[in-house]
Amino acid sequence: MKAKMSGTVAAGFPSPAEQYLEPPLDLNELLVKRPAATFFVRVSGDSMIGAGIHDGDILVVDRSLRPASGDVIIASVDGEFTVKTYRRDRGGVRLEPANPAFPVIRIKPGQELDYFGKVTACIHRFA
């Protein structure tokens, strides 16, 4: 999808009006870097609201990127899908929510953890 880009807008102090149009904005080009490895998934739940990911949002996920500690990922723990912040350190692997109402998932020896991709963008509608 391509849409007209109407310049920039100040989010702090007002800036002089810009009377020109930028080149068309291609949302696929903006959001999808590796089409063959990218999928979209709709969020169900509020465990990541502190990271700006809300119920009903659409996540852009790249399967080709390996997770690094601190990345938001899509994973399956014992067959249950989740979106969480991936943490790996000497204490092992854990999946952290961005909402204190939800528990941290600590991966125990023998527990099944499957990685499905790194979240690269979140599409959030205001209305």
Where are these regions (language model features)?
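Structural motif
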Residues: G56-D57, D71
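Short, hydrophobic/aromatic-rich segments at coil-to-beta transitions
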Residues: T38, A68-I73
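Catalytic Cys-His active-site segments of thiol-dependent hydrolases/isopeptidases
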Residues: R94-P100
